A protein has these predicted regions:
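Short, small-residue-biased leader/transition segments that mark boundaries at the very start
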Residues: 2-4
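Glycine-rich adenosine-cofactor-binding loop
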Residues: 40-43, 50, 59-78
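Active-site glycine-rich loop that binds ribose-phosphate moieties when present
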Residues: 45-56, 68-71, 90-95, 122
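Active-site capping/gating segments
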Residues: 48, 157-181
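Phosphate-coordination loops involved in phosphoryl transfer and adenosine-cofactor binding
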Residues: 57-60, 133
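Rossmann-like adenosine-cofactor binding region
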Residues: 91-160
C-alpha cells in the first residue's frame, strides 16, 4: 500500500478494481494467481468513514482538491452531485469556497492544506456557509485534529478526521491482501 494514491503504477498492472479504474489511481496492489491487481481504497474508505461516524451524507458535496484522493472522493459521492474547488481545473476556485459551501451538505478536504509541513487553509470562514448538520471530512491524518476539523467541530458540524480514512483503508487493504472479511467500525 502507499499513502498517496498514484496513477503511474497503473500501466504496470494486469487488472484494476472498478474503484481504481474510475478514480484513475491505485494505492493497494495485490498479487493474484500470477497477476497484479490494483485497488483504490480511498473511495470505499471515504464512504465507510462517513458511515462509521454515523454521517449519512445527503445533498451536494464540495470536494476541495483535484488529485487522486479528490477523484476518489468525487467518485464516492458522485450520486450527490459534486462541486470541485481547486487552484487549477476545479468547478470553483478556492476564493469561491463560501459561495460553493452554501450549496452543499458535505465537504471533503483532499488537499495537503493543514497537513504537517504544509500551509494551513488561508481562511476557514467558508464553514459558516454550511447548513446545520453538514459533514466535514478532512482526509489529513497528521496532525490528527487539523484546524479544519477543529473549526468544523466548533461550529457544531459533523467533523471527521483523516485517521478515520486511514483506519478504513487499512481494513480494506487487509481484506484485499488476505481475503478476510474484517468489519469496518469507527475509530
Amino acid at each position: 500500500t502507499c499513502a498517496l494514491p498514484i496513477w503511474q503504477v497503473i500501466r504496470y498492472l494486469d487488472q484494476l478494481s472498478p474503484e481504481a479504474e474510475a478514480c484513475g489511481a491505485v494505492n493497494t496492489v495485490c498479487f493474484r494467481n500470477g497477476h497484479t491487481v490494483g485497488y483504490n481504497t480511498d473511495a470505499p474508505g471515504i464512504r465507510a468513514g462517513f458511515a462509521a461516524r454515523g454521517a449519512s451524507p445527503t445533498g451536494r458535496a464540495l470536494v476541495i482538491g483535484n488529485g487522486g484522493a479528490a477523484r476518489a472522493a468525487r467518485w464516492a459521492l458522485a450520486d450527490r452531485g459534486v462541486i470541485t474547488a481547486a487552484r487549477r481545473g476545479g468547478d470553483v476556485t478556492m476564493d469561491q469556497l463560501p459561495q460553493a459551501a452554501r450549496q452543499c451538505r458535505v465537504v471533503v478536504n483532499a488537499t495537503p492544506l493543514g497537513m504537517e509541513g504544509f500551509p494551513p487553509f488561508a481562511d476557514l470562514s467558508f464553514l459558516d456557509s454550511l447548513p446545520a448538520g453538514a459533514a466535514v471530512f478532512d482526509l489529513i491524518y497528521a496532525p490528527r485534529k487539523t484546524e479544519l476539523y477543529q473549526a468544523a467541530r466548533a461550529r457544531g458540524l459533523i467533523a471527521i478526521t483523516g485517521m478515520e480514512l486511514l483506519v478504513q483503508q487499512a481494513i480494506l487493504a487487509f481484506n484485499h491482501f488476505t481475503g478476510a472479511g474484517l468489519e469496518q467500525e469507527a475509530t
